[in-house]
Every structure is written in C-alpha cells, then in structure tokens.
C-alpha cells in the first residue's frame, strides 16, 4: 500500500472528512514521525510496533564497479519492531505468489 492508496482508503472510510484533510493528516503524521526519529526519539504505537534507530558501525565496503575497498562511516538507520498484536495478526498470512511454492 502506498501513501496515496492509504489516503484514498481513509477518505472512503471517513466520508465526513475531505480528501485534503485526510491528506494533510497523513502527511503531518509521517512528518512528525520522521522528525522524531531524526531527533533520536523512539516511537511506540501499542499493538502495532515501535520505530527506533539502530547504529551500524563503520565498515569496509567494496565499490562494485571497480572492486576497490572503500571505508564506510558508521551511521544510524531506522528500525521497526512489530508489536505482539501485529505479529499475531500476520502470522498465518501467506503472501501472494507463494501459495504454489508449498510442497507436501
């Protein structure tokens, strides 16, 4: 699901809200979450999951084009940990296209 699909679905489910208002709400929520993470804060949405930053230490990488070694600096990357309710909700879901891969 893309951001525009989410806005469209929410607009249909909440018919009393204008599409522009839903668009603004979704964009504001995502902006606030991005701002909180970039400020080093952790975001926890009970039942859904938590967003935090994980540190990736400096390492030696390789330029795939030339094959030469490149020193890569340490950095923080966003990390999502699903909550218990979300894990339980998706535990029995089989992604599309994988049904034929099951062998008995």
Swiss-Prot record:
It holds the Pfam family Bac_DNA_binding. Heterodimer of an alpha and a beta chain. PANTHER family: DNA-BINDING PROTEIN HU, INTEGRATION HOST FACTOR SUBUNIT BETA. GO terms for molecular function: DNA binding; structural constituent of chromatin. Keywords: DNA recombination, DNA-binding, Transcription, Transcription regulation, Translation regulation. It comes from Xylella fastidiosa (strain Temecula1 / ATCC 700964). GO terms for biological process: DNA recombination; regulation of DNA-templated transcription; regulation of translation. GO terms for cellular component: chromosome; cytosol. The keyword Transcription applies. This protein is one of the two subunits of integration host factor, a specific DNA-binding protein that functions in genetic recombination as well as in transcriptional and translational control. Gene3D superfamilies: IHF-like DNA-binding proteins (4.10.520.10). Belongs to the bacterial histone-like protein family. This is Integration host factor subunit beta. SUPFAM superfamilies: IHF-like DNA-binding proteins (SSF47729). The lineage of its organism: Bacteria, Pseudomonadati, Pseudomonadota, Gammaproteobacteria, Lysobacterales.
